[in-house]
Amino acid sequence: MSLVIPEKFQHILRVLNTNIDGRRKIAFAITAIKGVGRRYAHVVLRKADIDLNKRAGELTEDEVERVVTIMQNPRQYKIPDWFLNRQKDIKDGKYSQVLANGLDNKLREDLERLKKIRAHRGLRHFWGLRVRGQHTKTTGRRGRTVGVSKKK
């Protein structure tokens, strides 16, 4: 970034209901969106033909629109299925990249489905216990500590 700020520089961009810092490089700035990691950001920017060294605030409206459309429709732009974060969806069997608020909704739906079918993982979530097989005898205790009274 040059020392002189361009005329059309935006310090904060609003993309997919997320505030993006315009001073950061675009590849790292769009990782602020839920469901977009560094690898996915790089692939999207390559498909959109945007310089990776550009700052997010230097993007034109057209470039921002291109990035958003590629992020929302990755399969149309030949991003492989194994790269996406929602593979073989339980309802429709489709592959997709879930972003921002949609990611929260999908996660909540998945947990509700697990609880409804009384799966072990769903029950552990319901009880507020560890889900992934960790030991819980000594760690992960909550609530007040109970002291030991000394015998006289």
Curated annotation (Swiss-Prot):
Keyword match Cell membrane: no
UniProt keyword Cytoplasm, yes or no: yes
Record key words, sorted: Cytoplasm, Developmental protein, Ribonucleoprotein, Ribosomal protein, RNA-binding, rRNA-binding
Cellular compartments annotated: Cytoplasm
GO biological process per UniProt: regulation of cell cycle; translation
Family as reported in the entry's similarity comment: Belongs to the universal ribosomal protein uS13 family.
Subunit (UniProt): Component of the small ribosomal subunit.
Function description: Component of the small ribosomal subunit. The ribosome is a large ribonucleoprotein complex responsible for the synthesis of proteins in the cell. Plays an essential role in early embryonic development.
Protein name from the UniProt record: Small ribosomal subunit protein uS13
Name of the coding gene: rps18
